[in-house]
A protein has these predicted regions:
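N-terminal pre-Walker A segment at the start of P-loop NTPase domains
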Residues: 1-44
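Interdomain motor-coupling "hinge/lid" segment immediately C-terminal to the ATP-binding subdomain
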Residues: 2, 154-234
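Hydrophobic anchor at the beta1->P-loop junction of P-loop NTPases
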Residues: 53
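Conserved lysine of the Walker
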Residues: 61
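Hydrophobic positions on the alpha1 helix immediately C-terminal to the Walker A/P-loop
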Residues: 64
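Short glycine-rich substrate-engagement loop in P-loop NTPases that contacts/grips substrate
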Residues: 81-110
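Conserved P-loop NTPase "ATPase switch" module shared by AAA+ and STAND
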Residues: 108-130
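Sensor-1/coupling segment of RecA-like P-loop NTPase cores
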Residues: 136-161
Length: 234
């Protein structure tokens, strides 16, 4: 693998120390509260295809992917079948095709491969590169995950390789910032078992108002202001 990507692929050298060597997981371990997204249980493991994860900048997409890599290793996926690349270091689709071809050739031939291309929209004409790789049959046995913050570009590019996404029922994912309910759960101020029936009913009522009534909700909790606006059912 290109040495530029080594800091994000320390699992190839020492999978048992991935949590300590990876920059994102190391930073995550220092935080007092760590959120585990439900997407970790929804991302593909068995079906090859081209998948996307969209979301705003700094919402945690890269950290989510590193958690997913660690989870794959924990589930006894061979580390050599997992690779992470970032589009910030790839100039154009020509470089992308060469790099991914080399990475896939270095992986074991048998079994499913897991390839992550983070911040794909940094790469000029990235969709041309992905289309070529798919048409050349190089992605037939690959769970290929692309991420990006520019939803318009990603949505437009998805249309350029229809029929090449794979057989999974779901191929597109979106990572949202934590909402108020998730923040409260993360704070561990209550559990569903310990909460009184009154509080549970109140919480359900609050969520219904938040979802169905299309207005701004402002809550002040623990000196933090939470603002939420919704015009559609989430």
């Amino acid at each position: 693998m290109d040495i530029r990507f080594s800091p994000h692929n320390s699992h190839l050298e020492d999978p048992t120390s991935f949590h300590f060597l990876d920059p994102h997981l190391r930073q995550l371990s220092r935080l007092p509260l760590v959120y585990r997204s439900e997407l970790l249980g929804q991302l593909p493991r068995l079906i090859p295809g081209i998948y996307t994860i969209s979301g705003g900048r700094q919402v945690g997409k890269t950290t989510l992917l590193k958690q997913w890599m660690a989870q794959l290793i924990k589930e006894n996926i061979e580390p050599a079948r997992i690779a992470y690349l970032t589009g910030e270091l790839i100039d154009d689709h020509h470089s992308l095709v060469r790099l991914i071809t080399d990475v896939l050739n270095d992986m074991p031939d048998s079994d499913l491969k897991f390839l992550i291309l983070d911040e794909v929209t940094y790469i000029k004409d990235w969709d041309k590169g992905v289309k070529y790789l798919a048409d050349a049959g190089l992605l037939e046995n690959v769970v290929f995950i692309l991420t990006g913050s520019d939803l318009v570009i990603i949505k437009d590019a998805r249309m350029r390789f229809p029929g090449r996404r794979g057989q999974s029922d779901r191929v597109d994912f979106f990572l949202y910032p934590l909402n108020f309910f998730e923040c409260v759960k993360l704070k561990s101020l209550f559990t569903f078992f310990a909460m009184s029936k009154f509080m549970l009913n109140f919480l359900n009522h609050f969520l219904c108002i938040q979802i169905y009534n299309c207005f701004i909700i402002i809550l002040i909790y623990d000196n933090i202001i939470f603002v939420h606006f919704s015009t559609t059912i989430l």
